[in-house]
Each structure stands twice: as C-alpha cells, then as structure tokens.
Amino acid sequence: MTVDAAATPAEAPATNGHGDAHSTASFTALTLGSIGVVYGDIGTSPLYALREAVTAASSSGEAAPHAVMGVISLILWALIVVVTLKYVVILLRADNHGEGGTLALMALAQRGVTRGASIIVLLGIISGALFYGDAVITPALSVLSAIEGTKLVTAAFDPYVVPLTVIILAALFAVQARGTAKVAAFFGPIMLIWFLVIGIAAFPPILRHPEVLWAINPVNAVSFMLHHGIVGFITLGAVFLAVTGAEALYADLGHFGKRPIQTAWLFVVLPSLALNYLGQGALIIADAKALENPFFLMFPEWALIPMVALATVATVIASQAVITGAYSLTRQAIQLGLLPRFEIRHTSEAHSGQIYIPRINKLLLASVVLLVLLFKSSSALASAYGISVTGTMVVTAMMGFVVIWKVWRWSPLAAGALIAPFLFLDLTFLSANLLKVLEGGWVPLALGGFVMTLMYTWRRGSRLLFEKSRKLEFPLADLVAMLEKRPPQRVPGTAVFLTSDPLSAPTALMHSLKHYKVLHEKNVILTIETAPTPRIDPSERVRLEQISPTFSKVTLRFGFMESPNVPRALAIARKLGWQFDIMSTSFFLSRRALKPAAHSGMPRWQDHLFITMSRSANDATDYFQIPSGRVVEVGTQVTI
C-alpha cells in the first residue's frame, strides 16, 4: 500500500530568504528590496570599472577623448546586451518553480534531458565552483575601492586604507552569525539613495561636455574595437567589470520575483549607472588627470567624506549579498549531493532562507583578508576579477540553451539562434579576461579549481560508495520475507532506520539483528530524497508504503533549497495513519569509517580526499534535526 501525504496547515511552504511570500508582500516593497540585495554588486562597479577600462585603453598613458568615448560606449552596450537582454528579458523566464541561479538552472536542465545528464551536472559544478571565486573577490575589491576614496581627502589616509578595509571586512563576517534580518530592511532604501546620488552627480560634468552623450551610439564601440586591435581586446576584460553582478539578477529570482527585479533594473539601476558612466567619461575628457579616481572626483570637495561613507556602506551591502549567496549555494550543493553535510544555522525563525554556515564564513573571511593583504589596491585586485564571472555566464548560456530547447521545447535551431549571440559575447569577454591570468586572474581560477575538485570528488566518491554498498548489502525484500517466516524476539516501540538505499537492508538493521537478536514491533525504513525543485509542496512531502505487518517504508522529499527537518515531516505521516510517537521511537543510523582500497575506481589521492571530506561532514543527527536522545548510532568500516 502506498499513500501520499495530504497538505496540512502544519507544513506551510517556507518563505524565502529576503522577503515574505510574494502573495503578501507589496510590489513596491519587493522592488525596493531587490534594489538593496540584487543590485549591490553591479551598483558599486562605477567605483572602479570605468577607471580600469580607460586605463587599459590608454596604451600611451594619456586618456584620449576618442578612447574614452569608445570605452563608455562599450560599457553602455554591455549593460544593454548582457544584462538587459540576456538576463532581464530572457533568463528571468527560465525559472525552476520560481527559483533562479546556476544550480537551479542545472536541476531544470537535467529534467529535460535523458542523455547527457552528466554533462549538465559537470557544467553546474563548474559554475558553482566559479561562484566561490567571485564571492571571495567581490567583498575585497568593493570595500577596498570605497576606502581608497579617503586618499582624495588627504594623502595622510594612504597608509590606513588596507588596515581599515581589513577591519570593516572582519566586522562584516563577525556579525553573520547573528543574522541580517534587522538591518536587511535598510538595504533597499540605502541602495536607492546610492543610485539616485551617483546618477544626479553625473549631471554637472555631462552638461559641461554634452558631446559625451554621443557615446550612446554603438558605432563608437565598434569603431574603438576595429581601430585598437589587441589593446581593444584587452580593454574588453576591464569593460566587463561594469557587468559583474549580473548573475545576481537570476540567482535572486526566487527572493523577489521577475517583475520587481525587471522594474528596478529598467527604471532605477540602469539609468543611474548609464548616467554615472557618462558623467565620469565627461570628467576624464575635460581633464585627463581625473582618471586617477573619476568616481569620487565628480563630487565637490565638501561631499567627499559623506560619499566615502556612503560608498563604504554600499560596498558592505554588496558584499553581504554575495556572502548570503555563498551560504545559499552551499546549501543547494549539499542537498544536490555535491558537497558533504555542513552545519547550517538558521538566523531567523520567520524566514527559512536566512542561514549561516560557520565553516563557509571562516573560509571566506580568511580568503578575503588574504586577498586584501596580497593585492593592497583595487587596481591590482581588479585584474583578478572577471574570470570567474565570465566563466559562470558562459555556463549559464549553455544550460540556458538546453532549457530553451528541451524544457521550453523550441527547435534546436531557434534555441541556438537566440543563445548563440550571447554565448559568443560571453566567450569573447572570457577570452579577454584570460589575458589577465598572470596579473591576478589565477586567483579565481585556483579557487574555482579547488572547489570543483571537491565537488567532483564528493559526487564521484558518493556514487562509488553507494554502488559498492548495494553489492554488499542484503536485499530488503528478502530480509523482510525471512523475518516474517522466522521472527526473532520482539521488543516494544518503533525503530526508524535511516538509509540512502531503500532497496537494501540498512546496515544498522543488520547489526541490530546480529548483535541484539531482537526486532521492534514496528520498523520503518526511512529514505530522504532531494527533488530537482527548490521546494516541495506539503502534499508531496511524505510517501508511506506498508511492505509487511511489521515493516513499512517512508520516503521524505525535500527541495534543494530546503533544510531537512525529519520530525516535522514525520508529523505528516501521523496524519496518514502511522501511529508515530517520538518518545517511543528510536532512530538507528550507521556511521561509516572509510578506508581506501587498492582498486576503488578513483585515484589514490582522490580516495584520501573523499575520506577526509566524509570525516568532516556534519553529524546526520544534527543535519536532519533528529532529537539526539532518540538516536542509536552503529559504526561500520567500509573500504572504497
């Protein structure tokens, strides 16, 4: 007998991390919230993007007006084509049950293919790994570029730029454990002020040099690329700094919804960014020396200190969005079987998406501070930026093609015609950024490569371990038949055996029979599955199957953005007729001690890496939120 759970009020869908359910939140609040969370990264790019791009274009050392016009034109059209057309118009439609992001896109693409699913997973691993490189560089570069504005007030601040940056970043990571719910409400209004200020500040230089508006014509961008050869190609790597953060539009789709994100971009963010880049360009055309720091030099001297303060707050907000994204991506990766279980703490009782992962927080803090101390300036660090983001964009375009073809059911020619121009542009930007590998671009590549190795090793090792365990374990159906024919001594209560393979007898059950030679009155084989969707409807959470008078199978399904809570999910099973009492129930878990084998299917070094990752995994009792007083752990040794 198989029974599906009915929806119950006790198991309401979880709300998202940064806002209430869309049905209760106003459109204006969601739009304002998206300005604060989604656009922090791309919104702080004017601090350094144009400066670095014009510097790259000025091979002779002088910022020639035609070069400045060409760079501005490239930036404006990158914002229009990459951000507006690719993300705002097309990719925001490719949602996985309302959620976005590369792993959500990977899960969506997997559902549409029967062959080649492993390639989709590999693309997802590459994209996810590269994001961590971005998550390390963004806080370091953003905060450093804001603090550098103090040098324009007085040169005496110069020696304190790096220490101040480190202090601010350390404070930012230190408060993560307390959650950001109380201050997150201010992110939107602060970033709205930021966008209004940087847009308005551009008017005086534009009015003094209105010819800069001619940069809106794409002919300037094309002419610049045609006449500058390799210099133009190198400049593209710096131009891309203006669109870093575009992935956040798609990644935060589930938090705010498509229309609020689109509205914020088209009516607030894009106009402000375009005006600011035009204003900086006009300033450099008027005075080539302004290239030193055109963003802050647009403001009068009396406004420098307030602007440095506002820029610092804006960059902290941008950094917070990336840090939160790293937590969210890690939870998704754990649920999708790409990383071992980490300790996940919920920082809000109201919003399940507001989480804190101590191990990730420590690794990010150490990496970010190391980058600041290593590169010391935003100009040096800008060389390291871009590769991870362009790599992610290339992968997103590839998976987007699969979704449009297989899920939306377009013809391959039509899907290719739509995606090919964006993929070509992304590959061009990636090629330009690869020229910066020796200057610092190796940093995100090294970080991404390390995380990619971890993800690939964990997935491959887990699969090999599963296959080996299935060969060694006894079929569950045969064991149940034997126990029904010759039942051992019964003890009162319910035993729940947690297993990843519902077809095989759990190791904990076999050890219980071998050592205690008793069987509980009721025995449940519990399997926890991760669905290829962000969240699971309560009506699909539990599947209960009676396989004999004393044995039943229970399958709990969770989305890849949910944190599994076994007791809460089992409460649904009670409503299906299962007489479940937590105080008379024992949970049996097997803890494996892994040893490398001579022929495991993986290289020796990968065996040892997998074993190390397995040992560092968070305890299943804590991860699945099972009451520790009701748990019995059985140790087993397995060779892989």
From Swiss-Prot:
Bilayer topology term: Multi-pass membrane protein
Keyword Secreted: no
UniProt-annotated stretches for the region Disordered: 1-20
Biased composition range(s): Low complexity: 1-15
Keyword set, alphabetical order: Cell inner membrane, Cell membrane, Ion transport, Membrane, Potassium, Potassium transport, Symport, Transmembrane, Transmembrane helix, Transport
Major subcellular site: membrane
GO cellular component, one term: plasma membrane
UniProt organism field: Bradyrhizobium sp. (strain BTAi1 / ATCC BAA-1182)
Subcellular localization, as worded in the UniProt entry: Cell inner membrane
Pfam families: K_trans, K_trans_C
Described purpose of this protein according to its UniProt entry: Transport of potassium into the cell. Likely operates as a K(+):H(+) symporter.
Cell membrane among keywords: yes
Catalyzed reactions: K(+)(in) + H(+)(in) = K(+)(out) + H(+)(out)
A molecular function (GO) term: symporter activity
Protein family membership: Belongs to the HAK/KUP transporter (TC 2.A.72) family.
Residues spanning the membrane: 30-50, 71-91, 117-137, 155-175, 183-203, 224-244, 265-285, 294-314, 363-383, 385-405, 410-430, 437-457
Protein name: Probable potassium transport system protein Kup 3
